Amino acid sequence: MTIPYLRPLVCACALAAASSAGAADPVADFYRGKSVTLYVGFPPGGGYDLYARVFAPHFTRHIPGNPPIVIKSMLGGSGAKAAGYMSTITPQDGTSLGMFLDAMTLGKVLGGPGEFDPVKLVWIGRIVSTATVSVVWHTSPVQTIEEAKQRQILMAGTVASNTSNFIPAALNDLIGTKIRVIMGYRGSPDQALAMMRGEVNSIGGMSWEAIQTNHQDWLSESKIKVFYAQGAHRIADLPDTPALLDFAVDERSRQILGLLGSGPDIGRSVVAEPGIPAERAAALRRAFAATMADPAFVEEIRHRHLGLEPLSGEEVQHLVAASVATPAHLVEEARRYIAPRETLK
């Protein structure tokens, strides 16, 4: 993924510099001599873990007091268990951070497990959006959403609770597409093989980064077309590819699709415990902004061919609050799309 133009974070960085220049800094006094734990809701070796390990050593340099950051994997609900742990067990003093599944807030809104309130978590900032797309094979008789309203397309999916299933279900209901999802594929490699063999015409959801890294021939030889982006808004790398809000036909569909597509906008974000002192929350957000603009961090991201599309903690907090504020009757409508459908035999 290319690195889009980094939005200026000058004010935040200036504030951070001013803070560190002061003779007495209670935040630095608190963190000095302590360590911070960054809980990752996935096992080591995956994308979230990689971003956490790239981010942490740079972030620690910008936190007042420079506390070392220890990364711990806490599995369970792709972060829901860790978010609950941070909300009920940890001291809630700013020494515990988390990096969880982008759709964790969506899952909670739809009634998923976890002893946490997404709005009460303190969102520190987003490193990058999660660019997930649906793709169609070049031989598919259906190549666009408009064509999918006229003719059935077979799409590979995984499980009912995955976006590869419930987003097509929502599109079928809200705008009249004829997407038939075949669930039961175990992951992206199985889905890719099924599409190339002609078992299905398309894949419900794949990481755009993974396509660029693992399937360069698909792009160079025009073997696929990106059907749509799974997020509410378009992907910077794919400005001509429609996203979910582009398909909205009225206020009802706009709110439902906005909720279902909220995960990619929240992306790979860093959160802190609810209830931490305001001055520490502000300091962590300033440190995050400074990290995103740090040339050493930007260069490492570039060297590792990772994406960088930062968003401030305040902006992520607003996105989360907007999802949670979705009217209850529309949440109920969205929930019914997450149900078992046709399964691979």
Predicted regions: what they are:
Residues A18-A21:
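N-terminal signal peptide c-region/cleavage motif recognized by signal peptidases
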Residues M99-F100, T158, G184-R186, G204-M206, ...:
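Short beta-strand and adjacent tight-turn residues that come in two discontinuous sequence segments
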Residues D102-G112, N165, A169-L174, R197, ...:
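A ligand-binding cleft/hinge motif common to bilobed small-molecule-binding domains
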Residues T37-A52, L75-S78, A156-T163:
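Extracytoplasmic "Venus flytrap"
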Residues D25, V36, R61-I69, Y85-S96, ...:
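Hinge/capping helix and adjacent helix->loop/strand transition within the periplasmic-binding protein
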Residues M1-V10:
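Bacterial N-terminal signal peptides that target proteins for export
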Residues V119-I127, K178-G184, N214-G263, S312, ...:
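Short beta-strand->loop
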Residues F30-K34, S220-K223, V249, D265, ...:
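An extracytoplasmic/periplasmic, membrane-proximal ligand-sensing/linker region
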